[in-house]
A protein has these predicted regions:
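Active-site pocket-lining/capping segments in soluble small-molecule metabolic enzymes
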Residues: 1-315
């Protein structure tokens, strides 16, 4: 109360000033909260996958537009995916602290000639290397590369990228203010809680370089999957790298299954299902239900999903 008379109403002053300068823009932004964008009945579904057994299913599954796979799985399934009419993309490392192994880029060039559509890019180092090779137009930016606002989106568009991924931190209201026409949105997956250079496997049992999966339990007995990336470039003939890392994932998967109609109203160009530790059976069931939901059909199963930041956003 003592300080109240010294406070100025910054919000009102700022709104008044902006409204005087750009009335049309303010009106358009205000309207975004009330007028939904055109809802597409059919939206392309892409998938990313980290496991051998699940990737076999995905390459032959109907309703999937394209697949993102790491090096070892592209090596095995590129031709199968192409034969089944899928767009095939190479998933690059989440963290890059060294050059690709010998022979990596030479093989990638051969795959491009064979029909590889492009790359899922997770960091600026990978993007820079591809851009220098004249491959910026084949880059799909993952959610880890900054595209929170329209200015950032315009920057990347000027670089000539293929598309970007909607940030995981924005809520539904914020996404309605974002230009999503060239964006892909993740609607299923285990969200990463932490990328760590401190290997859980090494610190607990010692390093074996076998890219194992572990589980951390909290005091509530919730289980958090941990994936060891001993060979970030995923070339089978390479040794475990010093630049290895772990990703710790959430205990529950994130899923916007019942929200399919609301996602379509955001105007995104495609949606993505991100598979990490799922079994073959889980993968098949989840794909069928999400493809049905986003293509306007009935869903067959019930799931327990977290909604991530879709409802409340990040502060």
């Amino acid at each position: 109360k003592l300080l109240q008379k010294y406070r100025r109403n910054v919000g009102d002053e700022r709104v008044k000033r902006i409204a005087e300068e750009t009335p049309a823009k303010i009106s358009a932004i205000a309207a975004c909260d009330h007028v939904p964008r055109k809802k597409e009945e059919y939206i392309p579904v892409y998938v990313s996958c980290e496991s051998e057994e699940a990737s076999e299913v995905l390459c032959q599954k109907d309703g999937i537009q394209g697949i993102y796979l790491p090096y070892a799985l592209i090596e095995k399934h590129l031709q199968t995916g192409l034969d089944n009419g899928k767009e095939m993309y190479l998933s690059l490392p989440h963290i890059t602290r060294e050059n690709p192994p010998e022979g990596y880029m030479e093989q990638v060039k051969k795959w491009l000639e064979a029909g590889l559509s492009g790359f899922l890019v997770r960091n600026l180092e990978s993007y820079s290397a591809l851009a220098q090779m004249g491959l910026a137009d084949k880059c799909v930016l993952d959610h880890s590369l900054y595209t929170w606002n329209d200015e950032a989106i315009r920057f990347w568009k000027d670089q000539g990228i293929l598309r970007n991924t909607v940030p995981l931190e924005l809520n539904e209201k914020e996404l309605r203010h974002r230009e999503n026409a060239g964006s892909e949105m993740i609607v299923y997956g285990r969200l990463p809680l932490m990328h760590s250079a401190q290997c859980v496997r090494k610190n607990t049992f010692g390093c074996n370089g076998q890219e194992e999966r572990l589980v951390l339990k909290d005091r509530y007995d919730k289980e958090f999957p941990v994936v060891c990336y001993c060979r970030p470039w995923k070339m089978g003939n390479t040794k475990a790298a010093e630049s290895c890392y772990n990703i710790i994932y959430n205990s529950l998967p994130y899923g916007l299954l019942k929200e399919a109609d609301r996602v379509k109203e955001l105007g995104v160009s495609s949606v993505r299902l991100a598979f990490t530790i799922e079994s073959r059976e889980e993968t098949e069931r989840i794909v069928e239900d999400f493809v049905a939901a986003y293509h306007g059909s009935q869903v067959s199963h019930e799931y327990e999903f977290t909604k991530g930041h879709f409802k409340r956003g990040a502060e």
